[in-house]
């Protein structure tokens, strides 16, 4: 007997064990709801609980697919797909253990069948497959317990139904990668709405789910040519909302990893749409607080663009200089690392356009009191290709950094930084000794002039202070003079009386 599939949006029954009925929206105090949500145990946020039906029919094992004749295979396959569309409550570890095991065994069998059996993916089973996948994976993600959630430090909220969900994702992936997969048939069901819901799942806190979603979306992008532009557009929307509205989306790193592969396959010359994506989305992504979570993937995307079109280099570097962090040393180190990756692929003709503003920023980093920032900036001179670019343009780069290098070599508190600066100055001296000597003399003369001006300023202030004191004494003397004239008169009048 076939098991009836529950609808994907079926709400939890108020009579379900362990769950309280949800009051109408107009009867709920928003503040009390928030405080109650924080007080609940972590496990209460499973998204599967909202679709579980306590009165569902008990599952019974079906015959194995390998044991039935070929004429009955597809009918049994449809029945197993229907079984796998039944949802269970994983918050209660001991509830429906038999049904959970029946579904798990059926999912395992489906994964093995679609991955190894040829001729099983015929057109009539496609709607059943997509329905089963949709019922299991598409759900409203639970709100984060911690509004200040830090992916690097806090433990993620794992999906309790993962024992089943993992097998559904594995089945979906095998389905897309099967030699019998027909995109022309599947596109009736894997449409824009399906893709949009798939993208929304990237906000899941569970990294295991996001890893599967990353691979699956990449396969969908490769199989369905008509959905490619739509996928890129929706990714743009997600990033823009992340930058300018919410600053919270768990799957940014995974989406950027997919886009890095997509960018690598862009045809030349690049379309205007793709260039705008770089300038309006990827560069502003450097401004968000959680940059460290996805910076490696973001930097890869940027470098891929520059390898495709070198003329974008100036826009990228000026954009990075615009968003350069002022107070976060960790982000500053990341920016310096990305800048070195860019300089590794930059063309000499493009380097000339950005060398002055770039190395002025590098000089500011060298003068940073945070030794990691200064150290990372000085490592530029350990890169042979960057060193060759500097040598070819020494007349511009050296004046931009010399003053800072010379001053920091005398004043920095960290001896490691001082040693690195001495090595850099020695390298510059070997590159162009004449220019180095001229800049040294100019720097010393400038410092002497500054000291002279400082001394003149001090003398001026000292003179003004002396003048103030003289005027103050003069004012006091003027006030005392009438009193001195008045004293004899008072004495004389006293004597007459």
Swiss-Prot record:
Region annotated Disordered, chain positions: 1-55, 475-497
Gene Ontology BP annotations: cellular response to growth factor stimulus; negative regulation of G0 to G1 transition; positive regulation of neuron projection development; positive regulation of neurotrophin TRK receptor signaling pathway; positive regulation of protein-containing complex assembly; positive regulation of transcription by RNA polymerase II; signal transduction
Residues carrying Phosphoserine: 32, 35, 44, 46-48
A Pfam family assignment: B56
Protein name: Serine/threonine-protein phosphatase 2A 56 kDa regulatory subunit beta isoform
GO terms under cellular component: cytoplasm; cytosol; nucleus; protein phosphatase type 2A complex
Function: As the regulatory component of the serine/threonine-protein phosphatase 2A (PP2A) holoenzyme, modulates substrate specificity, subcellular localization, and responsiveness to phosphorylation. The phosphorylated form mediates the interaction between PP2A and AKT1, leading to AKT1 dephosphorylation.
Post-translational modification remark: Ubiquitinated by E3 CUL3-KLHL15 complex; this modification leads to proteasomal degradation.
Assembly notes: Component of the serine/threonine-protein phosphatase 2A complex (PP2A). This complex consists of a common heterodimeric core enzyme, composed of a 36 kDa catalytic subunit (subunit C) and a 65 kDa constant scaffold subunit (PR65 or subunit A), that associates with a variety of regulatory subunits. Proteins that associate with the core dimer include three families of regulatory subunits B (the R2/B/PR55/B55, R3/B''/PR72/PR130/PR59 and R5/B'/B56 families), the 48 kDa variable regulatory subunit, viral proteins, and cell signaling molecules. Interacts with SGO1. Interacts with AKT1.
Keywords, sorted A to Z: Cytoplasm, Phosphoprotein, Ubl conjugation
Family statement: Belongs to the phosphatase 2A regulatory subunit B56 family.
Annotated InterPro entries: ARM-like, ARM-type_fold, PP2A_B56
Compositional bias annotation for Basic residues: 34-45
Subcellular compartments: Cytoplasm
Single annotated GO MF: protein phosphatase regulator activity
SUPFAM superfamilies, sorted: ARM repeat
Main location: cytoplasm
Induction cue: By retinoic acid; in neuroblastoma cell lines.
Tissue and organ expression note: Highest expression in brain.
Compositionally biased region (Low complexity): 1-19
Organism the protein comes from: Homo sapiens (Human)
């Amino acid at each position: 007997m076939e098991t009836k599939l529950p609808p994907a949006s079926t709400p939890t029954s108020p009579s379900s064990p362990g769950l309280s009925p949800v009051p109408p929206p107009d009867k709920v105090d928003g503040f009390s709801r928030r405080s109650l949500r924080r007080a609940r145990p972590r496990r209460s946020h499973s998204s599967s609980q909202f679709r579980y039906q306590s009165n569902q029919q008990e599952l019974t094992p079906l015959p194995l697919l390998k044991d039935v004749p070929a004429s009955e295979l597809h009918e049994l396959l449809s029945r197993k797909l229907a079984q796998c569309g039944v949802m269970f409550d994983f918050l209660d570890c001991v509830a429906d253990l038999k049904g959970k095991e029946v579904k798990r065994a059926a999912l395992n069998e489906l994964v093995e069948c679609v991955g190894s059996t040829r001729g099983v993916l015929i057109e009539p089973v496609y709607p059943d497959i997509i329905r089963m996948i949709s019922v299991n994976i598409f759900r409203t993600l639970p709100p984060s317990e911690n509004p200040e959630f830090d992916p690097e430090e806090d433990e993620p909220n794992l999906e309790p139904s993962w024992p089943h969900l993992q097998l559904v994702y594995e089945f979906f992936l095998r389905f897309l990668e099967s030699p019998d997969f027909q995109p022309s048939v599947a596109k009736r069901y894997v449409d824009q709405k399906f893709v949009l819901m798939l993208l929304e799942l990237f906000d899941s806190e569970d990294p295991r789910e996001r890893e599967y979603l990353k691979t699956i979306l990449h396969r969908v992008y490769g199989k369905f040519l008509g959905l490619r532009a739509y996928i890129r557009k929706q990714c743009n929307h997600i990033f823009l909302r992340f930058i300018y509205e919410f600053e919270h989306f768990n799957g940014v790193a995974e989406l950027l990893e997919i886009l890095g592969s997509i960018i690598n396959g862009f045809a030349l010359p690049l379309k205007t749409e793709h260039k705008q994506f770089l300038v309006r989305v990827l560069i502003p992504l450097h401004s968000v607080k959680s940059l460290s979570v996805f910076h490696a993937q973001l930097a890869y995307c940027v470098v891929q663009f520059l390898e495709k079109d070198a003329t974008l280099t100036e826009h990228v570097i000026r954009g990075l200089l615009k968003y350069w962090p002022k107070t976060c040393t960790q982000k500053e180190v990341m920016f310096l690392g990305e800048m070195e990756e860019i300089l590794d692929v930059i063309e000499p003709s493009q380097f000339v356009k950005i060398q002055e503003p770039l190395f002025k920023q590098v000089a500011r980093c060298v003068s940073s009191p945070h030794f990691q920032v200064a150290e990372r900036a000085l490592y530029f001179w350990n890169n042979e290709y960057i060193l060759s670019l500097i040598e070819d343009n020494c007349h511009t780069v050296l004046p931009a950094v010399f003053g800072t290098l010379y001053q920091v070599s005398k004043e920095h508190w960290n001896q490691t930084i001082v040693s690195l600066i001495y090595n850099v100055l020695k390298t510059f001296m070997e590159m162009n000794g004449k220019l180095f000597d001229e800049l040294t003399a100019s720097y010393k003369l400038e410092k002497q002039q500054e000291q002279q001006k400082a001394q003149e300023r001090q003398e001026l202030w000292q003179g003004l202070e002396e003048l103030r004191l003289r005027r103050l004494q003069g004012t006091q003397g003027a006030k005392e003079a009438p009193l001195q004239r008045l004293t004899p008169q008072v004495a004389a009048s006293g004597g007459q009386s």
